Amino acid sequence: RDLRLAIIEGDSLIDEILKEHGHPGQDMGERLKSIHPTEIDILNDLWEAHKIRNRLAHEADFHLSVEEAKKIIGIYHKTIEELLNIELELI
């Protein structure tokens, strides 16, 4: 449950950063489409993470393994570091 929440909150945080960086769109999906592939090294991974976040948020019976959840959190972590040009300590 905590990992599901971490994924949903991580996705929201990245969406807020994208808005602040001026990426247009009504939602995160539209903002992701506005990103040039050279802007984020792991853009495809971010897309996949966002799709899984949507399934977590909208499909009550969607199951995600702990390993997959940790992988997605790692993708969000790396994306935030890239977007903000900072190094974060993952706890």
Predicted regions and their residues:
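Short, exposed beta-strand-loop hairpins at the edges of beta-sheets
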Residues: 59, 68-71
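Amphipathic alpha-helical interface elements
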Residues: 1-42, 67, 75, 79-91
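Histidine-centered, metal-coordinating catalytic motifs and their short helical/loop contexts
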Residues: 39-63
